[in-house]
């Protein structure tokens, strides 16, 4: 067993099927990847494996780590996965998955690279296509695109590695202001994110973010109520989940808050029915604008603004879109599925069978 390798006992029985038993479609839960979110992705894969109906599907976890692609078998056993067709050996049997359930957070599973590979080998997968994945992974590009459809987003600037001096501190403070957030333009789980309160913190924060991405987004701070809402659509219909309210005990919803319990996640959110309906409607609309597929989750922050009539109202600002959202038992999506009165096993079955 390799050093720091996570052990997951996920192999189906290798005793074979009874004579005459129909073949179950083979589902590969694809996890790992090449970003700081590798281990988070493995936890999501464990969650999905526990949720999937294994009487209906034959399920394996496939971990990607650079050019090392391995299927998890019994105990610590691993099988090399062919990059030609994504097949692998289980004993003397060659297993060729019928479907890829992608749960890589970050590259290459959340930015279109892996989707392009599966398109080339004609294997259906759980997420949106190459264009949607690449756009939603690039926070700055996504913001500019959705602004054209009237979606409210924060003011932001982009800083690129090698051209850091093209955006001056004066420009940032004038157009964005302080405090502000400095974050990798392509990344997740709040790795490399800093809330900058003083000018002296700005450049160190940019350097930290560039450890995760060659592009850094400097984003205006918006005080308000943080919400998140999941959604998926298939030929059978649309499901927009109940809204979750996120109350962090940290400076912001950082890695510690997300994964170490320093947050209250309240589902359904303590908001008015009108605001709930607006958030759910916006989530559905963005799903359609982008042409998403599979389960997505959109994060928002609701701020107070004063209208021309002098009355205060809620403005819903889109923060980011997660196209491979976390799927552990305590992640937002399973919480929202339960709150909607649905069974996560049935949800995953619907998503998989919609693509087969």
Residue ranges and their predicted role:
Residues 74-80, 116-117, 252-260, 323:
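Short, flexible, mixed-charge acidic loops at enzyme active sites
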């Amino acid at each position: 067993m390799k050093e720091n390798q996570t052990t997951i006992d996920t192999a189906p029985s290798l005793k074979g099927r009874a004579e005459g038993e129909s073949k179950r479609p083979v589902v590969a839960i694809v996890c790992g990847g090449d970003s700081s979110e590798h281990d988070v992705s493995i936890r999501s894969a464990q969650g999905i494996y526990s949720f999937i109906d294994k009487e209906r599907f034959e399920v394996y976890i496939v971990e990607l780590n650079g050019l090392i692609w391995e299927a998890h078998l019994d105990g610590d056993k691993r099988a090399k996965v062919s990059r030609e067709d994504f097949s692998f050996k289980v004993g003397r049997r060659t297993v060729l998955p019928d479907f890829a359930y992608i749960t890589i957070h970050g590259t290459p599973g959340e930015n279109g690279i892996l989707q392009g590979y599966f398109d080339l080998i004609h294997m259906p997968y759980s997420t949106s296509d190459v264009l949607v994945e690449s756009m939603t992974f690039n926070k700055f590009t996504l913001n500019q695109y959705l602004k054209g459809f009237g979606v409210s987003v924060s003011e932001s600037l982009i800083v690129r590695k090698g051209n850091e001096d093209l955006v001056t501190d004066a420009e940032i403070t004038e157009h964005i202001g302080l405090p502000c957030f400095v974050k990798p333009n392509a990344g997740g789980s709040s790795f490399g994110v800093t809330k900058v309160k003083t000018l002296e913190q700005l450049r160190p924060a940019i350097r930290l973010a560039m450890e995760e991405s060659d592009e850094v987004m400097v984003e205006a701070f918006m005080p308000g109520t943080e919400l998140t809402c999941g959604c998926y659509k298939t030929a059978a219909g649309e499901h927009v989940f109940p809204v979750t309210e996120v109350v962090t005990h940290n400076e912001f919803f950082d890695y510690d808050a997300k994964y170490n319990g320093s947050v209250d996640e309240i589902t359904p959110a303590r908001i008015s029915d009108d605001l709930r309906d607006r958030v759910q409607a916006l989530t559905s609309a963005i799903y359609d604008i982008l042409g998403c597929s599979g389960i997505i989750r959109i994060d928002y922050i609701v701020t107070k603004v004063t209208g021309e009539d002098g009355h205060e109202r809620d403005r819903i600002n889109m923060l980011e879109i997660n196209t491979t959202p976390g799927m552990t038992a305590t992640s937002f999506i399973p919480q929202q599925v339960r709150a909607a009165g649905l069974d996560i096993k049935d949800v995953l079955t619907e998503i998989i069978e919609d693509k087969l």
